[in-house]
Amino acid sequence: MDILCEENTSLSSTTNSLMQLNEDTRLYSNDFNSGEANTSDAFNWTVESENRTNLSCEGCLSPSCLSLLHLQEKNWSALLTAVVIILTIAGNILVIMAVSLEKKLQNATNYFLMSLAIADMLLGFLVMPVSMLTILYGYRWPLPSKLCAVWIYLDVLFSTASIMHLCAISLDRYVAIQNPIHHSRFNSRTKAFLKIIAVWTISVGISMPIPVFGLQDDSKVFKEGSCLLADDNFVLIGSFVSFFIPLTIMVITYFLTIKSLQKEATLCVSDLGTRAKLASFSFLPQSSLSSEKLFQRSIHRDPGSYTGRRTMQSISNEQKACKVLGIVFFLFVVMWCPFFITNIMAVICKESCNEDVIGALLNVFVWIGYLSSAVNPLVYTLFNKTYRSAFSRYIQCQYKENKKPLQLILVNTIPALAYKSSQLQMGQKKNSKQDAKTTDNDCSMVALGKQHSEDASKDNSDGVNEKVSCV
């Protein structure tokens, strides 16, 4: 049934209109059945019925009337936003559970990611549903006016917290690469949580002016019945402080981190190359074989080579982590940049730009920015095995990793250990045999040298005696 939306119209007038419409319909059906209706009668009836059943909103500017109109239409955009809300809440809950329950993920970077997931989850709980409600009501505020400033405050708070967390992660990893000893000494769980508290404090401080001024003056948060920031100064300052400045810091430190990792990898490879050359270089004459072998063994057993391998492994892990974080950074920038750029354009070219087009773009771009909160858990799932296995177990309601029974562990490990021990014993026997051979060769060489020297001295003494006898 269509809606007669005329302001200040009583229920009786609406009822009378509907009764008149039914009466006209009945008369027309009787005339049509009796064959007396012609084309002109049908046309007159159609025009009259359309005039009565059209949504006549002349003078109807109240939000309640307009909201009823929009609720009658199918709104596919609201359905899409509902899907985004569900993905955001569910995915970030899985991230929070994974960092809380998995010991492998309990480090400084993942604590930041857990706090970021909390911000995204709260965005999905408190901000996105209200935004979907405004879509259903034609982008007009359907709730009490005092809640508008609170809703904008939460929106700015959680969005600012997201970019601040990414900026803090980038800074923390850069400091860890530049000063690893200092960072490992002073980097603990308490320090990580203190940094997270600092990030939230900065985010609250940036977004706090919205409820302070918005609750006092509705014109700062309302514009033509829509709940949005109407203060141009706050739009400009807030966009730069909460997005563009942290974005610049994040991008610069991220590229510096990549450059430092590449430099360390090059130095580590060159260091391993010099160690290999030293191991193959001979300092002694060829006759002294045992000393050379002992020197080579001491080089190969040098713990520095193990340290070099461990350093290469740590650099490789850092590069993999930077790759995942780089994807998260890139997606966040790509999804939020259109909104903030359009937001600044709306303030700069206020008179020359079409406000309707700018408003429509902002309504679309803000949901693209919200989508980044749902994408992060998918990135972790695709590029991190620990997150992927944890998510799959949590979906199956298995919150602890299944451990193998002790008997199965013994069956699998004891033969391997026995094989390794036998190999070690065989290697030790071979080494002892080779050492015995080399020592025998050395002893024989020494004996030959002694015999040769004795023979030479004997010959010399015989020559002297012959000379004496001749004299």
From Swiss-Prot:
Disulfide bonds join 148-227, 349-353. It comes from the Eukaryota. InterPro entries: 5HT2A_rcpt, 5HT_rcpt, GPCR_Rhodpsn, GPCR_Rhodpsn_7TM. It is a multi-pass membrane protein. Belongs to the G-protein coupled receptor 1 family. The record marks 229 as: Hydrophobic barrier that decreases the speed of ligand binding and dissociation. Interacts (via C-terminus) with MPDZ and PATJ. May interact (via C-terminus) with MPP3, PRDX6, DLG4, DLG1, CASK, APBA1 and MAGI2. Interacts with GRM2 and DRD2; this may affect signaling. Keywords: Behavior, Cell membrane, Cell projection, Cytoplasmic vesicle, Disulfide bond, G-protein coupled receptor, Glycoprotein, Membrane, Phosphoprotein, Receptor, Synapse, Transducer, Transmembrane, Transmembrane helix. The chain crosses the membrane at residues 81-97, 112-137, 147-171, 192-215, 233-258, 323-348, 357-382. Pfam families: 7tm_1. This is 5-hydroxytryptamine receptor 2A. It comes from Macaca mulatta (Rhesus macaque). The gene is HTR2A. Residues 1-80, 138-146, 216-232, 349-356 are extracellular.
